[in-house]
Swiss-Prot record:
One Gene Ontology MF term: structural constituent of ribosome
Xref: PANTHER family: 50S RIBOSOMAL PROTEIN L36, CHLOROPLASTIC (PTHR42888), LARGE RIBOSOMAL SUBUNIT PROTEIN BL36C (PTHR42888:SF1)
Protein name: Large ribosomal subunit protein bL36
Lineage per the UniProt record: Bacteria, Pseudomonadati, Aquificota, Aquificia, Aquificales
Source organism superkingdom: Bacteria
Keyword rRNA-binding attached: no
GO biological process: translation
Length: 37
């Protein structure tokens, strides 16, 4: 899980979602997981 100021999709399977007021990217590829900090 990377914490970034700007989260972007890195591939076609990445999805941008909101959980508990945080913007996150979830993906099958573990290195693509991101969270906005």
């Amino acid at each position: 899980m990377k914490v970034r100021s700007s989260v972007k999709k890195r591939c076609a399977k990445c999805k941008i979602i909101r959980r508990k007021g945080r913007v996150m990217v979830i993906c099958e590829i573990p290195s693509h997981k991101q969270r906005q900090g």
